[in-house]
């Protein structure tokens, strides 16, 4: 991303682009923020952390009646301390909503010396000014973009620095390990005595203990983070079964809309239909698949092949049965594929409102999609997924963070083998230093511009 200058004064609409919103906020940040706003604001220039009333004017014409919040910093000796979000002079104009007036104020700020901010530039400046690290910036972005209350709660908990503390604790443990190994490099005579003592007392190498402890924590973080990210983005649920068991009816009931064709003709769903299903604090990406059976129609064969692929891609497979028809070879085929691929699997009997002579065992969940009676299914789904600890400090639920943790693990695995097999300690130090640097990237202790560009490009314009 080509930022023109970090010393420029920037501005942007921070309240979104809803044309009918009652109030809008225009944010201005930079060393010339006060002088630029003063050119278009008729009210009093406020002191730091005050709000003043007045009018935005273009020449003598009133554009809007506004409140202006001033965050101009406090002199402390020879420096000015900025206790605000960005860490530099910051002003926010609270105007009446509507894009005509809001854009006019933005236009006046730009014509008087400000420039339009890049996406995420306010937060980028906050990072560069030491007001936050990248783990907190990640939390802010994820909080804004949260799709469920669980996700929002998890990200909000990181605003006090819990994610940063996890990384710093890991770095502290890693520093002890690196220091211990470096002693062995610089003073090998002590290591010989140390290893003889280990053999005599059958004690595990303290360095091996430390790297194993570090690896266990990293593995836990990766597992928790991948699970959480999957839940936050949407759990993929494939509805599979023979034709005409009610898969499309169930999909429509869950989505509360007619997404799929529902008829009495078997095989009418020939492609995969997707929809988003919200259940309490969980998001499910529902996939309604073509019924699995023998067919001579080429187009239906393609749909059935896609159904098998949907099973492989799903996080959980909902195998739907018809209350009037017992299991057969096609149901067994589905069950076999699910078991071979170690998928979460639930068996659901539809049309429970119809009388049947079939005795279904207790592990079958009974519903009636046609009558919108799916509470048993919903309760079961919540039981499966509600046990996960969404408040864990080990959750770092962005693709960027997970990628860096996985890279860290690879360096840790390599270092462990070098320590375990008593290879040269110098090689272990190289991998451990790479591990240290990779963990530092998670909180942003790096001068890499490409890392910052990738980090902030997805932020909204006024953040």
From Swiss-Prot:
Annotated residues for binding of K(+): 244, 263, 265, 268
Entry's Gene Ontology molecular function annotations: GTP binding; GTPase activity; metal ion binding
UniProt: (6S)-5-formyl-5,6,7,8-tetrahydrofolate binding residues: 27, 92, 131, 463
Textual note on the cofactor: Binds 1 potassium ion per subunit.
Protein residues bound to Mg(2+): 248, 269
GO biological process: tRNA methylation; tRNA wobble uridine modification
TrmE-type G domain residues: 234-386
Known cofactor(s): K(+)
Binding site for GTP: 244-249, 263-269, 288-291
Pfam families xrefs: MMR_HSR1 (PF01926), MnmE_helical (PF12631), TrmE_N (PF10396)
InterPro entries in UniProt: G_TrmE (IPR031168), GTP-bd (IPR006073), GTP-bd_TrmE_N (IPR018948), GTPase_MnmE (IPR004520), MnmE_dom2 (IPR027368), MnmE_helical (IPR025867), P-loop_NTPase (IPR027417), Small_GTP-bd (IPR005225)
Gene3D superfamilies named in the record: P-loop containing nucleotide triphosphate hydrolases, Probable tRNA modification gtpase trme, domain 1, tRNA modification GTPase MnmE domain 2
EC number: 3.6.-.-
Leading EC class: hydrolase
Entry's family note: Belongs to the TRAFAC class TrmE-Era-EngA-EngB-Septin-like GTPase superfamily. TrmE GTPase family.
Complex and partners: Homodimer. Heterotetramer of two MnmE and two MnmG subunits.
Protein purpose: Exhibits a very high intrinsic GTPase hydrolysis rate. Involved in the addition of a carboxymethylaminomethyl (cmnm) group at the wobble position (U34) of certain tRNAs, forming tRNA-cmnm(5)s(2)U34.
The protein, known as: tRNA modification GTPase MnmE
Organism listed in the record: Mycoplasmopsis synoviae (strain 53)
Lineage, top ranks: Bacteria, Bacillati, Mycoplasmatota, Mycoplasmoidales, Metamycoplasmataceae
